[in-house]
């Protein structure tokens, strides 16, 4: 029973971590989508600057778009991976929860007959 309780807590923590990570990735996805939309509106010969630390570095329009698209691809893949991990953990969580309920039912004293 103790082992099941530990596993239950670990899975609960794992699921919370996945949910937090998914929220962060969704925010990054939204931000990068907005950046890409803004880059689409800008003329190809416009000056684009990328902040690297405290410095602004000039970047070509095409290079900026390519970098943002690459980031978006990566973020989408990470979201898919985490969603899959979350699903697997939720299934395991349900199994452990069921096992705990069964163990508690087996350990409970029988009801006296009326």
From Swiss-Prot:
Coiled coil: none annotated. GO terms for biological process: chaperone-mediated protein complex assembly; protein folding; tubulin complex assembly. InterPro entries: PFD_beta-like, Prefoldin. Pfam families: Prefoldin_2. Keywords: Chaperone. GO terms for molecular function: protein-folding chaperone binding; unfolded protein binding. It comes from the Eukaryota. GO terms for cellular component: cytoplasm; cytosol; nucleus; prefoldin complex. Belongs to the prefoldin subunit beta family. PANTHER family: PREFOLDIN SUBUNIT 6 (PTHR21431:SF0). Heterohexamer of two PFD-alpha type and four PFD-beta type subunits. Binds specifically to cytosolic chaperonin (c-CPN) and transfers target proteins to it. Binds to nascent polypeptide chain and promotes folding in an environment in which there are many competing pathways for nonnative proteins. This is Probable prefoldin subunit 6. It comes from Schizosaccharomyces pombe (strain 972 / ATCC 24843).
């Amino acid at each position: 029973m103790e082992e099941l309780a530990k596993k239950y807590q670990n899975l609960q923590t794992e699921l919370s971590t996945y949910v937090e990570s998914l929220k962060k990735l969704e925010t990054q996805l939204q931000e990068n989508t907005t950046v890409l939309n803004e880059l689409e509106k800008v003329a190809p010969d416009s000056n684009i600057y990328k902040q690297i630390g405290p410095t602004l570095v000039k970047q070509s329009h095409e290079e900026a778009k390519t970098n943002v698209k690459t980031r978006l691809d990566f973020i989408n893949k990470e979201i898919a991976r985490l969603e899959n991990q979350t699903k697997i953990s939720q299934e395991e969580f349900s199994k452990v929860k069921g096992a705990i309920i069964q163990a508690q039912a087996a350990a409970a004293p029988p009801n006296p007959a009326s």
